[in-house]
């Protein structure tokens, strides 16, 4: 079997831990029954020996496969990782969702996306990345009694993303330590209103309001202080026809959204201006993970 799982960009400014969308940048994993266990890694992490010794995908896969099938079989895992690691593009969510869905498939069970999403919550307790990795599109989610409830909206085909990827790993755990311990009532209301309005902009295609709807007072500034150049990335994007520009997840990547022609032009300008960073033009994925 082969499974493709997309990269994701979460939070989107004010939608902390609840908003996210799916990008056409995929991790590809092939799994085959084998006489002996083996792992092959290409792309991101291929030079990391620890990913072969203690692989999270493999660990989750076997945990669920053995629970579902009652068997202890050997498999050959072939990873082609295209999602940058620890850059705020959902690499951990792609691993979790991919492992769970693969285990269900290889155990002979029906792969139901709602079930996969609920089970993924066990391994990542906020749905902002795992939901779009599972469902695709723009997704608004909440958690109630250990279950994920999501509403998905397909993203307009006229839009595209420009993602700026610094050469700085930033784990979610590390990034959360930078967050303020207390939040004022006014700032809480600010984020609630902006996250709600941002969601409505995507649902109703009111893209002209995204620039101010995507503002945040909860997490972005504190996280961006770890890499001050990101403030310039955001300013430059908004001055060059980006409809919105936000920290991607916990960082260090930065996500900008624009109409396709503007996004292509912005990507070229970004690459020229920010020579030390990788810049990718990406279209949006509306399917979530797919088993081939």
From Swiss-Prot:
Its EC number is 2.7.1.39. InterPro entries: GHMP_kinase_C_dom (IPR013750), GHMP_kinase_C_sf (IPR036554), GHMP_kinase_N_dom (IPR006204), GHMP_knse_ATP-bd_CS (IPR006203), Homoserine_kinase (IPR000870), Ribosomal_Su5_D2-typ_SF (IPR020568), Ribsml_uS5_D2-typ_fold_subgr (IPR014721). Keywords: Amino-acid biosynthesis, ATP-binding, Cytoplasm, Kinase, Nucleotide-binding, Threonine biosynthesis, Transferase. ATP binds at residues 84-94. It is found in: Cytoplasm. One of its GO terms (molecular function) is homoserine kinase activity. One of its GO terms (cellular component) is cytoplasm. Pathway: Amino-acid biosynthesis; L-threonine biosynthesis; L-threonine from L-aspartate: step 4/5. It is an enzyme of class 2 (transferase). It catalyses: L-homoserine + ATP = O-phospho-L-homoserine + ADP + H(+). One of its GO terms (biological process) is threonine biosynthetic process. Catalyzes the ATP-dependent phosphorylation of L-homoserine to L-homoserine phosphate. Belongs to the GHMP kinase family. Homoserine kinase subfamily. This is Homoserine kinase. It comes from Campylobacter jejuni subsp. doylei (strain ATCC BAA-1458 / RM4099 / 269.97).
């Amino acid at each position: 079997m082969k499974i493709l799982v997309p990269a994701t960009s979460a939070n989107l400014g004010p939608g902390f831990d609840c908003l996210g969308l799916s990008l056409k940048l995929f991790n590809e994993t092939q799994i085959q029954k084998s006489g002996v266990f083996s792992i092959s890694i290409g792309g991101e992490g291929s030079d990391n020996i620890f990913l072969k010794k203690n692989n999270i995908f493999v660990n989750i896969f076997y945990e669920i496969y053995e629970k579902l099938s009652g068997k202890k079989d050997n498999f050959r895992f072939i990873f082609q990782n295209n999602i940058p690691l620890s850059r705020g593009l959902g690499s951990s969510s792609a691993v979790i969702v991919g492992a769970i869905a693969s285990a269900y498939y290889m155990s002979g069970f029906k792969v139901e996306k709602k079930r996969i999403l609920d089970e993924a919550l066990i391994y990542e307790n906020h749905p902002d990345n795992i939901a779009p990795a599972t469902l695709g599109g723009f997704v608004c989610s909440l958690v109630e009694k250990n279950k994920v409830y999501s509403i998905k909206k397909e993203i307009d085909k006229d839009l595209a993303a420009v993602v700026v990827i610094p050469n700085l790993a930033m784990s979610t755990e590390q990034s959360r330590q930078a967050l303020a311990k207390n939040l004022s009532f006014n700032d809480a209301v600010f984020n609630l209103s902006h996250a709600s309005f941002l969601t409505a902009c995507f649902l109703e295609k009111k893209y002209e309001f995204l620039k101010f709807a995507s503002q945040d007072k909860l997490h972005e500034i504190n996280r961006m202080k770890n890499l001050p150049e990101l403030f310039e990335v955001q300013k430059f994007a908004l001055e060059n026809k980006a409809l919105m520009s936000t920290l991607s997840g916990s960082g260090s990547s930065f996500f900008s959204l624009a109409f396709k022609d503007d996004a292509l032009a912005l990507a070229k300008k970004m690459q020229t201006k920010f020579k030390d960073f990788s810049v990718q033009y990406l279209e949006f994925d509306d399917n979530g993970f797919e088993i081939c």
